[in-house]
């Protein structure tokens, strides 16, 4: 697991040295960031999510929305002026004061009227009845690479490697998709995802340590990155993410895996002020070439009752691979995987 720490090397400027200043800075930047995101019709999406108890889970609603109604791309050039790549670290530092919101961690943009659309970028399979107009949805696009991984593109080895992973995932589909050999698609994708997860977690860890040293100059924040990386990779696979094939895991067994991950999160819900816990599962039907995106959710009700904490597994999206472009399938796969990594990192980094 040893990696060159320069892989994630970035130039960070100190923002605040005290919790008070950090909170003030956070509130100011978050307000401006929220103005940027006001065009997102998430309230309209949430109002149609069933069952209603999930409508307050911002990250779940955001994942549904992006998988089903947003143009997913690998690069955005037109919204760099309001670009806060370190928002995720600020939220982690203030974990007891803020609710982490995925919409702050990805770069979104309005698509201008009349702008040429690349059909390969379209991800408008609407399995969620959101009630948002198709026209309005088509005017939104999002970069699947989180802000924290893409803000130093010209110098970032990690960013270049992410683009290589996009090509590798597509190459697998190009090679085995026409033959409908989805068993080999799974075998290759599974290996790619494993190394991809480690790459992104390592990148986040190096940047997190640099950020912590700048914002907490009087604290001891040095971490043994290989050890912490190993711990996060284990937690990611145990609690937050799974990718299973139909030939060794039935859909019922897949559901059980996600419910078991929910069970591991129950103590966290009781221990910390969180109303929801989220995990991510991919299931590939290797006979028919169908990729199912699914979330496991633990929800704590406000009312104190014997059924206060509930565990659910909910489908988020479905793709028949041969009916969609390789580009579209890979972008959705990678966005979903990125979301699982961010969920793991933001939940666990302060415990490492």
UniProtKB/Swiss-Prot annotation:
Biological process, per Gene Ontology: homologous chromosome pairing at meiosis; meiotic attachment of telomere to nuclear envelope; meiotic telomere clustering; positive regulation of maintenance of meiotic sister chromatid cohesion, centromeric; reciprocal meiotic recombination; regulation of reciprocal meiotic recombination
Protein name: Non-disjunction protein 1
Source species of the chain: Saccharomyces cerevisiae (strain ATCC 204508 / S288c) (Baker's yeast)
Subunit comment: Interacts with MPS3.
Subcellular localization(s) per the UniProt record: Nucleus; Chromosome, Telomere
One example GO MF annotation: telomeric DNA binding
Primary location recorded for the protein, binned into one broad class: nucleus
Induction statement: During meiosis.
Protein keywords: Chromosome, Meiosis, Nucleus, Telomere
Task performed by this protein: Required for telomeric clustering (bouquet stage) during meiosis 1 prophase, formation and efficient homolog pairing, meiosis 1 disjunction, and telomere deletion during meiosis. Also promotes meiotic recombination.
Keyword Nucleus: yes
CC terms in the record's Gene Ontology section: chromosome, telomeric region; meiotic spindle pole body; nucleus
């Amino acid at each position: 697991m040893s990696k060159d720490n320069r892989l994630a090397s970035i130039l960070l400027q100190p923002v605040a040295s005290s919790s008070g200043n950090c909170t003030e800075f956070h509130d100011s930047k978050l307000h401006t960031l929220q103005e940027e995101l006001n065009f997102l019709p998430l309230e309209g999406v949430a109002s149609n999510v069933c069952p209603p108890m999930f409508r307050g889970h911002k990250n779940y609603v955001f994942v549904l929305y992006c998988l089903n109604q947003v143009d997913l791309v690998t690069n955005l050039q037109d919204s760099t002026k309001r670009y806060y790549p370190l928002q995720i670290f600020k939220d982690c530092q203030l974990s007891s004061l803020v609710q982490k919101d995925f919409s702050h961690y990805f770069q979104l943009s309005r698509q201008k009227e009349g702008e040429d659309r690349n059909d390969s970028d379209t991800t408008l399979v609407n399995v969620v009845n959101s009630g948002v107009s198709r026209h309005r949805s088509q005017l939104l696009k999002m970069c699947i690479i989180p802000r924290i991984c893409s803000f130093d593109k010209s110098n970032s080895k990690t960013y270049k490697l992410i683009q290589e992973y996009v090509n590798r995932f597509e190459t697998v589909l190009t090679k085995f998709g026409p033959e409908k050999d989805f068993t080999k698609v799974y075998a290759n994708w599974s290996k790619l995802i494993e190394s991809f997860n480690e790459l992104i977690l390592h990148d986040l860890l190096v940047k997190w340590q640099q950020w912590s040293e700048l914002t907490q100059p009087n604290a001891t924040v040095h971490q043994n990155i290989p050890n912490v990386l190993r711990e996060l990779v284990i937690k990611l696979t145990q609690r937050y993410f799974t990718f299973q094939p139909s030939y060794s895991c039935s859909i019922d067994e897949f559901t059980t895996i996600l419910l078991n991950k929910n069970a591991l999160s129950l103590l966290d819900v009781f221990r910390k002020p969180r109303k929801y816990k989220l995990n991510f599962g991919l299931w590939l039907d290797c006979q028919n070439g169908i990729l199912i995106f699914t979330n496991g959710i633990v929800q704590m009700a406000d009312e104190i009752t014997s059924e206060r904490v509930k565990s659910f597994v909910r489908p988020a999206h479905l793709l028949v691979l041969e009916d969609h472009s390789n580009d579209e399938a890979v972008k959705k796969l990678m966005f979903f995987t990125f979301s699982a990594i961010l969920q793991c990192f933001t939940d666990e980094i302060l415990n490492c």
